[in-house]
Structures are given as C-alpha cells and as structure tokens.
Design a protein with these regions (language model features):
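Methionine residue identity
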Residues: 1-4, 17, 27
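The alpha-helix within a helix-turn-helix
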Residues: 212
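Bacterial N-terminal signal peptides
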Residues: 24-32
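Non-transmembrane domains of secretory- and envelope-associated proteins
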Residues: 37-42, 47-50, 68-70, 100, ...
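N-terminal mature ectodomain segment of secretory-pathway/periplasmic proteins
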Residues: 43-124, 172-176
Length: 302
C-alpha cells in the first residue's frame, strides 16, 4: 500500500511538472505575439493621432486635389481643382481645372448670406451667388464646397475614436511605408466590420445633408440610397429613409511621413470603390492674406 501511494504521488508530481512546463511553453510562445501586437497598436495609434494633430495645427493651406467619385449609374466622374483654404473661420477660394475649367468659387462662412460666389466661366460671364449645396457647385460630385480640405476628415476620425475607444485601432491594419507620388507615406487600411445599411426615422424639417453632417456620414451615399429625396429637401417627422451607420465600409489612407497629412484617400462602400481623393501641391506653410479671400483679389475673375 505504501508503494502504491508513493507511485501515485510520483505520477501526480510528473503530471504537475508537465502542465507547468506546458504553461511556460505557452507563455514563451504567446508573450512575443502579445508584445508585437502591442507595439503595432502603439504605432497605429501614434500615426492616427499625429495625423489629427497635424490637420488641426494648420489653419491655412493650399492644394490641388484630384477626385474620382462613383455616380448613381456606376460610372466614375473625375475632377480637379486648386484651392486656398482657411479652416476657421471657414473660407475657401477654388478654381476648377476639370470639369468646368476656369470656373471659380469663393465661399466665406457667415458672409454673403452664407452663399458661395460663383464665376461659372461661361456666357453671360457674370458671377452669381448660390447655396453651397447647389448642384452646379458639386459638378456632379459627392461633396459641397464646405466639405473641401481635411476638417471633415478630422472630425470623422475623432467621432470614431470617441465611439470605439482603443478598439478603433483593432479595425486598422498597418501596411508599411510606401513611396507614393515621390512622397514616403504610411499606408493604413481601416475595415469597419460593423458597417451596414439601416432605417432612420427623420426629425421634422431635417435634410439629408443635415443627417449626414450630424452623424458623420457620406451625403452622396444617402442621396443614392434615397434617390427620390433632394439633399436640401425638408423631411417629415418619423419619415423613414435608408442610411448607413458609418461613413464607409473600408478606408485606405496614404499618410505623408513628413507632414502626416492623408494625401491619398480611397473610400469603399458595400459595392466597392466609392470615391478617392488625391492631394498634390500641398502647401502648409504659406500665409494666405485676407485679400486672397476677396472677389477683388488680382487674378480672380468674379
């Protein structure tokens, strides 16, 4: 009986040692993975926060932007314009290169009855004031002149960080450093796994644009999902429309390694490529004089 007890104790000790060794093995295996995961999360967070800080730190910028946006019929509409922009208070001068080459837009928040001054560059060659949502100003594009630049982009990211907390960075894949347009860029891909179409009950007098603005959604997407409704049409109380719960399903960014601006943005919905924006000739350091946001500035044709 003593022999059997000793044998049983010995077997238990061997099993305990085996479990202990297996535990050490798992720790050794998983610790580097956990450490690498943590380091990558820190890097992703650092890139995103530096990007937001850089955007918020530059009130005046000038740039040339190329856009390619999917239309309601599935074809892509391209355009290009040059702009001088002040983020706060919002002011922008833009000159079209395509389509509507030579057309100019001047919008100053709170001035001219909050309308944009437009030189359409065609007969009878007079400048007219329009609501910023007017279709002529969009040139068949997705966004109005008030959404140009990076401010909306910054607000979008901040809303997602507030909503998801640190879990937001789990959506992000760090793809490495790439040379793009002769600039070294961090490339990140954001997959919004919970993106979906939902029903929305409208408040009295809301418009599609206001719903998009208040919920950080893509107004063009709402327009396509509700083709019978104009952006500025006032909706009825409890009217049911279809919206998305997030701006995009997937977002690919090339973030300039030097200045941390997202100079190439590729946006996907549930169908595929929805829109992309390319920023070139980005100038972050010049001072734009007040007269440059005036119709009297030399070189403008208002």
């Amino acid at each position: 009986m003593v022999f059997m007890a000793n044998k049983s104790d010995s077997t238990a000790n061997i099993l305990f040692m085996n479990y202990k060794l297996f535990g050490y093995f798992l720790m050794a295996l998983l610790f580097p993975l956990s450490k690498n995961y943590s380091q990558e999360t820190i890097l992703k967070k650092e890139i995103v926060l530096k990007m937001l800080d850089s955007i918020d730190s530059h009130n005046q910028i000038s740039f040339e932007m190329f856009r390619s946006e999917r239309g309601e019929n599935g074809t892509y509409i391209n355009g290009k314009f040059f702009a001088k922009l002040q983020a706060s208070p919002y002011k922008i001068y833009a000159k079209m290169k395509s389509p509507k080459e030579g057309a100019e837009i001047l919008y100053l928040e709170g001035e001219n009855n909050n309308k944009a001054l437009v030189n359409p560059n065609f007969f009878p060659y007079i400048s007219i004031s329009f609501d910023p949502n007017f279709s002529l100003l969009k040139a068949d594009g997705h966004h109005n002149i008030k959404e140009a630049g990076f401010v909306l982009f910054s607000q979008l990211f901040k809303s997602h960080i507030k909503k998801y907390g640190d879990s937001f960075y789990d959506f992000i894949s760090y793809d490495g450093i790439f040379n793009w347009n002769e600039r070294k860029c961090y490339k990140i891909t954001i997959n919004y796994v919970d993106y979906k179409l939902i029903k929305y009950s409208c408040k009295e007098g809301e418009t599609l644009y206001e719903i998009a603005e208040n919920n950080y959604l893509n107004v063009a997407k709402l327009r396509f999902l509700n083709p019978e409704i104009n952006d500025s049409k006032k909706l009825q109380e409890s009217q049911q429309i279809t919206i998305t719960n997030l701006y995009s399903k997937k977002l690919i960014l090339y973030i300039d390694k030097q200045n941390y601006f997202p100079i190439y943005q590729i946006v996907f919905d549930e169908i595929g490529l929805f829109e992309k924006y390319i920023y070139t000739q980005l100038n972050l350091n010049s001072t734009i004089k007040a007269i440059e946001f005036s119709r009297e500035y030399k070189g403008y044709d208002f």
